[in-house]
């Protein structure tokens, strides 16, 4: 069951009810609180574009609590974050794993945060293939290409050498907020506002 809270706001015209996500969007806050698939990515991209159209000079805040998900869907969010004019700050609440960690690191440098008990996990892309040998070979080449591409972007975003990223993403690599800060995935740990 997916319950979405509703909030009531008093205005000079009376009361207005919002679902919580729409109300947060008014404050330029976007929640990524699920696995990343095409539907989630389309929703996040749409919100980023909408907020840019509202005010291209005001920051957008992307809160992340995600186990990761589709690389192509995540790259749509990443590319949009880099494309739009407003700076996007990222805040890890709970867990930013896999593509969630990638998007956390994709925030504006100096504006990537985590709460103290958050966890971040990086690893190499996951995939599978079936079919004829040539189809399996094509899929394997693609996933190796994606691994190198993601590692290079993470190296650029964190300041870590590419060789370190290749080693550290070989297996699931879980980090506390403190370790993510040392690693360069985030810039600060928030303890209060």
Swiss-Prot record:
The keyword Hydrolase applies. Keywords: Cytoplasm, Hydrolase, Protease, Serine protease. Gene3D superfamilies: 2-enoyl-CoA Hydratase, Chain A, domain 1 (3.90.226.10). It is an enzyme of class 3 (hydrolase). It holds the Pfam family CLP_protease. It catalyses: Hydrolysis of proteins to small peptides in the presence of ATP and magnesium. alpha-casein is the usual test substrate. In the absence of ATP, only oligopeptides shorter than five residues are hydrolyzed (such as succinyl-Leu-Tyr-|-NHMec, and Leu-Tyr-Leu-|-Tyr-Trp, in which cleavage of the -Tyr-|-Leu- and -Tyr-|-Trp bonds also occurs). InterPro entries: ClpP, ClpP/crotonase-like_dom_sf, ClpP/TepA, ClpP_His_AS, ClpP_Ser_AS. Its EC number is 3.4.21.92. Fourteen ClpP subunits assemble into 2 heptameric rings which stack back to back to give a disk-like structure with a central cavity, resembling the structure of eukaryotic proteasomes. Belongs to the peptidase S14 family. This is ATP-dependent Clp protease proteolytic subunit 2. It comes from Bacillus cereus (strain ATCC 10987 / NRS 248). The gene is clpP2.
């Amino acid at each position: 069951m997916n319950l979405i809270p509703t909030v009531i706001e008093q205005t000079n015209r009376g009361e207005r009810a919002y679902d919580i996500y729409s109300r947060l969007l008014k404050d330029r806050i976007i929640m990524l609180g699920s696995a990343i698939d095409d539907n989630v990515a389309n929703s996040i991209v749409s919100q980023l574009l909408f907020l840019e159209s509202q005010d291209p000079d005001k920051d957008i805040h992307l809160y992340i609590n995600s186990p990761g998900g589709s690389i192509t869907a995540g790259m749509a969010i990443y590319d949009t974050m880099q494309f739009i004019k407003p700076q996007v700050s990222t805040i890890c609440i709970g867990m930013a794993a896999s593509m969630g960690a990638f998007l956390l690191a994709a925030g504006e440098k100096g504006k990537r945060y985590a709460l103290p008990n958050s966890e971040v996990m990086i690893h190499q892309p996951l995939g599978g293939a079936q079919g004829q040998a040539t189809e399996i070979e094509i899929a394997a080449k693609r996933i190796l290409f994606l691994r190198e591409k993601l590692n290079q972007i993470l190296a650029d975003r964190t300041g870590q050498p590419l060789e370190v990223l290749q080693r550290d993403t070989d297996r699931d690599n879980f980090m506390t907020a403190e370790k993510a800060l040392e690693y360069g995935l985030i810039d600060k740990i928030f303890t209060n506002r």
